[in-house]
Amino acid sequence: MERKEDDLKGGCWNQPAVAEEFETLKDLAMDFTVEDWKDLESEWDQRDLFWDVTLNHYQDMFSFTDTSQPSLTSQPDVREELEATSTEVPETKSSPLQSGFVEEDFSQIMEIFSNGQLNFEACIGEDWLNSFLGDPESLPRPDISDKESPADHQSPESKSGLSPGPPLCTREDAVMSASPEKTLTPVILKESRSDLSQEDSVQGHEKPYKCSECGESFSQSHHLIQHWVLHTSGEPPIWREQQRGLSQGAHFPMCPGTPASYESYTCQECGKRFSQNVYLQWHQKIHTGEKLCKTQSDSNLEGLSRSPSVEPGKQRLSKDTDSAKPSTIHGQDQEKPPTGESRDQENLHESQPGDRPSVLHPKPLRHQKTPTNAKCFRCKKCGETFSGAFHLAKHQRAHAQRLYKCASCPAVFNLSKHCFQHRKSHFPSAACECQGCRKSFNWRSSLIKHQAIHKGEKPYKCDECGKAFNHSSTLKIHQRIHSGQKPHKCSECGKAFCRRTDLTEHQRVHSGFRPHQCPVCARTFNRPSHLVRHRLRHAEERHFGCAKCKETFIYKEQLERHNKIHTIEGLYECKQCGEHFICRSTLNCHLSIHIRENTSEKVVGQNSQHTEKCFKNTKCRKAPNHSRYLGQHEKIHAQVTSGECDPCGETYDQSVQPICHQSICAGVKPSECAEPEKCTRNTSASEHHPSQREPSFKCDIYNRAFKQRAHLSKHQLIHITEKPFKCNECDRAFKQSNYLIQHQKTHTAEKHFECSECGKTFHQRSCLSKHQKIHSGEKPFKCGDCGKAFISGAQLIRHQRIHTGEKPYVCQECGKTFSQSSCLTLHLRIHTGEKPYTCGTCGKAFAQRANQRKHERIHTGEKPYACGLCGKAFGLRTHLQQHQRIHTKAKP
């Protein structure tokens, strides 16, 4: 519909049937604070550009589509261009609004713009105007009469009852005085162009704004601008469209910058570019570590509420405002600071009598958001900081008492959802089952993660070592190995771990909680992996076999370690004696022997890296090769250090001689003790008489006590009558798998370990080491009572039972006692009638191997025992002893 010229001259600019879509002046508001403009003072081109942007929008409001617009980047002087703009508007007969508006009203507006007489605060916004002009005091402002009633200056549209659209200003701001003699009626628009265009585009699904880079279309122009930021280089498509003259039919919002300087501010640290210096300063706070965590809204509101009324035309700015505000065009944020901080509060004060009324409507107060990298919430108990209050509340539950307990196991939790998730582990769901390996899971997400193993997908790769992982969380845990980060620390011993699960499993060592139990032998474990490894021994799943000696193993690493035996030399060599070892841990244990024997500086210097792993006790000469064993050994000295014998008055160190010295002097046997079931039977430093120390771990069957849980577990194997480990060659059964492995080596024909002195071969390296001590004459284990030395510690223990008279092994059939378990085993064959050893010549069976060997000498004629006087030889040692009595004339 066309509009008459007399209507325009009369000031009726907003008729209900308007064909042309106008923008509200509010959409042109660009609010900045003084701090923002100070950052842009050095860039005078930016000031000129913002003037050009404002004038161009006003020309779009009051001109026609075929009106040529002046260039935005070619205006040397702002005031000259403003004056020139008011006179360069052409006349077009095809437009009904040209003559009246362009000649009179628009020329008046341009004249007021150029002369600086227009009250911009009533049109644009005081925050934007003061920050735009720099110094608020340097702008000449007209005086608005306080005596005039606001109702006298209302527009005809407002009086006629027309409902305006988005309000641009209050009705008191309807009069904009250019001078006391000259007034200009403002434009009160019914709807803004952005609102109309948005409504039309939604109804018609039109997307007129198209990106020239990728061809994507948008219904709103600001969406196109936000999309263009994704393209790393080049100028905005809006500028290219305007340069080609293609934007006259559609309105594009203006960007706060020219195409040449769209992203002219570059960060020196990371190379990121920004369109304004204030955004660059916000971004640089990430590199400097500066964190503005305190919300300024409360302090701003308090400061503004107490501030006195300002004079008309003066600027209202809070002194507490310290954060810049990005420019807005058409109500859209052109760019947001990297820290995620919201815009400052504006128009917080209410209008006072005599004050100039506010232009824009007050907006609700919004707090600034905390930066994403800031941690402003601190726990009062442990001092740990968090970025949000929710995370702090979640962390504080860890300090509180755990309330949720699982009904199926002793596990407790501090969150109900964790307890619910744990309870599902006791009832696995059949729906979440892997079709490849038939493994079931409690959650579908766990099934999806597991299926990635079968697919072989490892998208997450470590930059340090190149190792790939299935999940990003696994990669983060792996990267802690390179960085050395161990955030999870044990409160009992101070040991740190990379993963929380490792800390949980470690804490079970202090608490003694072993939730994983073997259903076959009832043995408990504190880790599920240990239980899985243990159950493989019951199943006898030995998939890895040696190609040379046909020996089988459960794990692949055991086979790799075994293959090193067939090599000529071991990988690790001792620098002191030249002995080779397959494992480094075995070499470290061997080096501890040299360190105990020779404490010279030369030995310590040559093995400096290994001596750190050897821990020596200051009270005795015992030096275990691990700190854990040293800590267990030092507990003996902490509780019991020495004792005194009443009959003889002799003092002794019970850590070195743990056998009860009083029973030796008095001749009291352990069977005569008041509590024979608690008497010790060996020289282990962890098992003492109850008069010296009270162990904490007790056996329920024999009521026997032990100091360490491992000793109790080893003792409980005696009560287990079942022998699940059977030999396939001779059907012999064993209680432990290691005994079966040692036994199976006797059936193999190869003996890989050969003695270099006598050429004798052995199945195990430990047997060879014991045998070599015979040639060297080394007997490190010495009896403290008679001074007799032995090669091994087991021989010393058996010998010391002669002095104490201890016979802990009792036959259940006849009650006979024995000092050694092997003697009890041989004795039990009398009751059972078992004779496992058979002569290969005559088929005679024997209960003991020694008797079999003696019998075989009859068939072979071997006589190894010869008399030293007459040279006569005998097949048995007893026959030689009887013959020697002839020469000595001794009577039996």
From Swiss-Prot:
All copies of domain KRAB, residue ranges: 23-101
GO terms under biological process: mRNA 3'-end processing by stem-loop binding and cleavage; regulation of DNA-templated transcription
Extent of Polar residues compositional bias: 66-76, 84-97, 297-308
Record's compositionally biased regions (Basic and acidic residues): 138-156, 190-203, 313-323, 332-353
Tagged with keyword Repeat: yes
Gene Ontology molecular function, alphabetical: DNA binding; zinc ion binding
SUPFAM superfamilies in UniProt: beta-beta-alpha zinc fingers (SSF57667), KRAB domain (Kruppel-associated box) (SSF109640)
PANTHER family in the cross-refs: CHROMATIN-LINKED ADAPTOR FOR MSL PROTEINS, ISOFORM B, ZINC FINGER PROTEIN
Family: Belongs to the krueppel C2H2-type zinc-finger protein family.
The protein, known as: Zinc finger protein 473 homolog
Phylogenetic lineage: Eukaryota, Metazoa, Chordata, Craniata, Vertebrata
